[in-house]
Structures are given as C-alpha cells and as structure tokens.
Design a protein with these regions (language model features):
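Protein kinase catalytic-loop region centered on the HRD/HxD motif
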Residues: 91-103
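Conserved short submotifs of the Hanks-type protein kinase catalytic core
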Residues: 54-68, 72
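Flexible N-lobe loop architecture of eukaryotic-like protein kinase catalytic domains
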Residues: 31, 40-43, 56, 141, ...
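C-terminal lobe helix-coil module of Hanks-type protein kinase domains
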Residues: 146-215
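AlphaC helix of the eukaryotic protein kinase fold
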Residues: 16-38
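Activation segment signature within eukaryotic-like protein kinase domains
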Residues: 87-88
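Activation-segment/catalytic-loop signature of the eukaryotic protein kinase fold
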Residues: 50
Length: 215
C-alpha cells in the first residue's frame, strides 16, 4: 500500500476473519504487535502501526522488496558456508536487538526471513507468533514445527534460547538444503526434536568447516 502522509510504500498484514471474532486473540495480537513496534533495527522488518477498521485488524510494516530465505534456499539448493554465515550473522543481530528489549520471536524460520534486492537480511513477524501460538492452529504450523525448539515441542517455558535453537536449524538448512527432522505429522517431527540426534550437516555438505558444524 502507499502511505500518502509520508510518501512511502508499506506492507499490510490483515488478521483472518476467523481470528478477528476472538476478542482474547485480538487483544493479545494488538499487545504483542505494539510491543514489537518499539523495535528498530536494520535486520528487523519494522512495524509502523497497528489498528482496526470496520472489523479488520491490521499491522502496517516496512515493505521489503525481495524474497524469503526459504525461496532463496529452494532456488540455490544449498548455500556456501560463507554465505550461510553472513545471513546467520544478520539474523542473529536482529534477534539480539529484540532479546535486549525482552521480545522473543518464537517462530524463526526461513519463511520469516527476508533477503532484500540489495542483499540486506531482515527478520519479520516479531509480535505475531506469540498470539498465534496460544490458542490457534494455523496452516503454517507444519512449516514451523521443523524449526521448533524442544521446549516448544513439549509446550514448555520459552525464552530467548528457543530463537537461538531455531536459528541453528535455519543454518543447518542453508548449508544442507534440508531440515534435520521431517515427518508426515507435526507430532512426529516434534518428537524427533525431543528424542533424536540430528545427522551431522557435513554428511550432506562437503567441505563444511568443523567450527560451523559445532554451531
């Protein structure tokens, strides 16, 4: 959309109608989004406004021209470790800025990471995951469970370490072109996060430095 006041393009996310009728969800959605609106960092998609009009609840955010990291991985198959590290560092900087303000993302995955046409990496959807995870099941759950921390898999206490774990899974996918755990159901994948040892990424990514494998 075009912001006529400031003369810039913005992205708008609108809450689905089935969620808009849940007052508790809407209240949590607004609270979380308003908290995230206080985040300003080069590696975060900034939130400009939160509001509602005629029953539609929306978030106005920075418009990033580019593609998601998920699409980028699918196009390239596997990323070199140097490129993966560069992307991971930028994601980590964004996550750190949020954690410094006591904001946890809870849904770090390649679909929530944008790569702009200039090569800048930005994490999006801060403030949305917590509201969505509490009492709803979205179509994105199957995609998210591949990156969920063990504590998320068991519905336990979540803190900043969950985001770090998820970033580790994202790094694994960048260099191998696959996620470490997969299955036909969300439960099957979640159980693997809790119980299974992941195959070392060097099995799929030749010449991977030992230092990165340890991460």
């Amino acid at each position: 959309a075009k912001d006529h006041t400031l003369g810039r393009f913005v992205a708008i996310k609108v809450l689905k109608p089935e969620f808009s009728e849940d007052r508790g969800f809407v209240a949590k959605f607004r609270t979380e989004a308003q908290s995230a609106a206080g985040l300003e960092h080069p590696n975060i998609v900034n939130i400009y406004d939160v509001g509602s009009e005629e029953g539609l609840h929306y978030i106005v955010m920075e418009y990033v021209e580019g593609i998601t990291l998920k699409t980028y991985i699918e196009k390239k198959g596997q990323l070199s470790f140097k490129e993966a590290v560069s992307i991971a560092i930028q994601v980590a900087r964004g996550i750190e800025a949020a954690h410094n303000k006591q904001i946890i993302h809870r849904d770090i995955k390649p679909q929530n990471i944008m790569i702009s046409t200039e090569g800048k990496v930005k994490v999006m959807d801060f403030g949305i995951a917590r509201a969505a995870s509490s009492n709803t099941v979205s179509s994105d759950v199957m995609g998210s469970v591949h990156y969920s921390s063990p504590e998320q898999a068991r519905n336990g206490f979540v803190d900043g370490r969950s985001d770090i774990y998820s970033l580790g899974i994202v790094m694994y996918e960048m260099v191998t072109g696959r996620v470490p755990f997969d299955g036909d159901t969300t439960v099957a994948v979640a159980i693997q996060h809790l119980q299974e040892e992941m195959t070392p990424p060097s099995v799929y990514a030749k010449n991977l430095p030992i230092s990165m494998e340890k991460i």
